[in-house]
Amino acid sequence: MEDFVRQCFNPMIVELAEKAMKEYGEDLKIETNKFAAICTHLEVCFMYSDFHFIDEQGESIVVELGDPNALLKHRFEIIEGRDRTIAWTVINSICNTTGAEKPKFLPDLYDYKKNRFIEIGVTRREVHIYYLEKANKIKSEKTHIHIFSFTGEEMATKADYTLDEESRARIKTRLFTIRQEMASRGLWDSFRQSERGEETIEERFEITGTMRKLADQSLPPNFSSLENFRAYVDGFEPNGYIEGKLSQMSKEVNARIEPFLKSTPRPLRLPDGPPCSQRSKFLLMDALKLSIEDPSHEGEGIPLYDAIKCMRTFFGWKEPNVVKPHEKGINPNYLLSWKQVLAELQDIENEEKIPRTKNMKKTSQLKWALGENMAPEKVDFDDCKDVGDLKQYDSDEPELRSLASWIQNEFNKACELTDSSWIELDEIGEDAAPIEHIASMRRNYFTAEVSHCRATEYIMKGVYINTALLNASCAAMDDFQLIPMISKCRTKEGRRKTNLYGFIIKGRSHLRNDTDVVNFVSMEFSLTDPRLEPHKWEKYCVLEVGDMLLRSAIGHVSRPMFLYVRTNGTSKIKMKWGMEMRRCLLQSLQQIESMIEAESSVKEKDMTKEFFENKSETWPVGESPKGVEEGSIGKVCRTLLAKSVFNSLYASPQLEGFSAESRKLLLIVQALRDNLEPGTFDLGGLYEAIEECLINDPWVLLNASWFNSFLTHALR
C-alpha cells in the first residue's frame, strides 16, 4: 500500500501526510491504510479549492487557464495540511476579519464567498452514516459539512453542495479512479474495511465472546440482538413515549410530562425561625493563635511542649469570668474546667521533666462536661421482652432555623489569603507514575494560589486535631487527656511558626464501632466578642480570660481575649475523614484541571501557563443577589477549595440530601439554558425532597440561598 500511495499521489501531498502521521505518533509503515486515507483527504481538499476564485465584482468564478494579470482572489482558504499552530492562527485571523464564529475543531477550508468554514469528509462507508458522525463530533451549526464517497455519492449540509456540478464530478472521478487502482492491486478490501468512524466520546467497543453472549441474553423482551437494541435506543424519541409507557405500567401512575419553561421553577423555600448557630468542631474565622517563631526549644514537635511554649508568649491572663452563658449548660463547670487546665499546666511547668502527654484529674466539672455516667444503661433485649410498654424514647423534631449572615462571612473569610503558607509544595502528593511535566506544572501553579489561603489553614488544623484526637482515643481510652490544638506554618520570610488555638479534653473513648461517640470539651482562644452575634454562639459558653495588646495605626490597643468553651462529640469514622481533609486540595485541583482541559481542547494546545498567568482574565466565582461574581483564577482556586473544605467541616445528612436532590433541579435548569426543551413530571415532589433537607444547618441554608440566586440569574 505504501508503494501505491507514493506512486499515486503528488509528492507534496505524500510529504504532508507523512508529517501529519509523525505529529500523531503513528508509523506509516504499519498504518498504511491510514496513510492512504490522509493522502486522499488532502487531495480532495486541494481539488475542492483548485480553480475557484472571486473576481473584482465579488462573484465566484472558475478559472482553469485564465489571464495571469486578472485581479482574482482565491475563493477558498486551505486549512487542512497546515501546521496546527499556523492553522489556528489562520482561523483566528479569518474570524477577526469576517466576524465568523470560531470553530471548536480544526476545519478543512474557509469559503470567502459564503463566509463559512467547511469540513470535508471522504468515506468508504455510507455517506449519511459518516455525515452524522461528523455532525455529532463538530456540534456546530456554523461549520458546513460536505461528504464524498468512493462510490460517487455525496452529502452536504442542507443539500447545499457549494461547488458547481463539474468541479464535484472531477473529485468523484478521482476517488473512483483511486478505488479502481487499489482494487487492481488487491488493496481495496483491506482499505475499505479499515475505516473507523469519527472518534467521539460515544466510541463503540466491540463486544465478543462470553460478554457478547451475556449481552444478547440480558436484552429487554422483543429484542433479538444487541445491534437490534442499540439501533432502537439510538433512534428513540423520548417525548410523549415515556408518558404512554408509564400509563401502561400501573393504573396508579399518572405522569404527565410538563414542559419546563423559564417561568416554571420557583425559588426554594428557606425555613423561618431563630438564626442558625455555629456547629463546626473548631472555630474558623474567630480563632486566635498564640504563636512562636523559629521554634527550637527542648522537645520541639511534642504537642504538650509546644503548647506550653506558646502559652508562655502571652502575659495578659486574668481572672476568668463568663460573658456569654450557655443557655442549657451549667456554666460554672465550664469556668472551673478552664481554671483546672491552667492549674494543671502550671503543675507540669513546676515538674523537673515535662511529660509527653497530660491526663486531667477526673473532677466533677470535667465529668459533667464530658457526659461521664450520663449514657443510659444498656440492657440486654432478652431481659426486657416481657415489658409491656417497651418503646423507643421519643426524640423531638429538629427546630427550624433561618439563614444567618455569619455563615456567608465565614465562607468569604475562608477564601481570603493569610500572611502565612500552610502547605509545602508536596502536600498534594506526587503521582505514582513518573509525573508528566504538565501535571506537575498545574499542581505547582495551583499550590501557589492556595498555599496561603485560610481554607488551607482549616485543612491543616482539621487534620491535626482529628489525628491527635483519634490517637488519644485509642491510646488512652479511659483518660481525660489534654490535647493541644496546634498548627504549623511558614511566615512570608520563610520562618517556621507553631500556633496554639486552644485545647481539647477528651472523655472516655471505648470506640468499638465506627459510629461510637467520643465526647470532648473544646476551649479555644478568640478576640471575637460573642455578644455581637449571640445566636452564632448558642452552643458555647464564652469566658473572658485575658487582655491582649494589639498593634494598630494609633499605637498599641488592649482588647479582651475570650475563650470559647463547649461540649462536643465525634466518632471514629468522622475523625478518619477529618484526618483526610487534604483530599479537599485534590478535589479542587481536579475541578480546576477540568476547566483547563476545556479551554485547552478549544485552543487545541495546553493552556495551563496562559490560564494561570493571564492576570487580566476574570472567571465566574459564584452567584450573589447582584449576579454572577467574577474574579481572578487564584480567586476561583480558593473559592473551589473553600467549598470543598466547608463540605468537609459541615458534613451532614442534610448536606448529602440537599446536594443529591438539588443537583437534579440544577441539571434540568442547565438543559433549559442549553435549549434542550426539558420536560418534567412531579416537579413538586422534587422541590419537597430538596426542601426537607433545609432544616437548621448553616452551610446547607447558605447553599440553598446561592441556589436561589443562580435560579434568578440563570432564567432571566
Swiss-Prot record:
Modifications after synthesis and translation: Phosphorylated on serines and threonines by host kinases, including human casein kinase II.
Binding-site residues for Mn(2+) 1, renumbered to this chain: 41, 108, 119-120
Residue span of motif Nuclear localization signal 1 (NLS1): 124-139
Cellular compartment(s): Host cytoplasm; Host nucleus
Principal cellular location given in the protein's record: host cell
Cofactor: Mn(2+)
Coiled-coil portions: none
Biological process according to GO: cap snatching; DNA-templated transcription; negative regulation of viral genome replication; negative regulation of viral transcription; negative stranded viral RNA replication; protein import into nucleus; symbiont-mediated suppression of host gene expression; symbiont-mediated suppression of host mRNA transcription via inhibition of RNA polymerase II activity
Keyword terms: Cap snatching, Endonuclease, Eukaryotic host gene expression shutoff by virus, Eukaryotic host transcription shutoff by virus, Host cytoplasm, Host gene expression shutoff by virus, Host nucleus, Host-virus interaction, Hydrolase, Inhibition of host RNA polymerase II by virus, Manganese, Metal-binding, Nuclease, Phosphoprotein
Uppermost EC category: hydrolase
A Pfam family hit: Flu_PA
Lineage: superkingdom: Viruses
The UniProt record lists the keyword Manganese: yes
GO molecular function, one term: endonuclease activity
HAMAP family recorded: INFV_PA
The protein's role, per its UniProt record: Plays an essential role in viral RNA transcription and replication by forming the heterotrimeric polymerase complex together with PB1 and PB2 subunits. The complex transcribes viral mRNAs by using a unique mechanism called cap-snatching. It consists in the hijacking and cleavage of host capped pre-mRNAs. These short capped RNAs are then used as primers for viral mRNAs. The PB2 subunit is responsible for the binding of the 5' cap of cellular pre-mRNAs which are subsequently cleaved after 10-13 nucleotides by the PA subunit that carries the endonuclease activity.
Family: Belongs to the influenza viruses PA family.
Protein name per Swiss-Prot or TrEMBL: Polymerase acidic protein
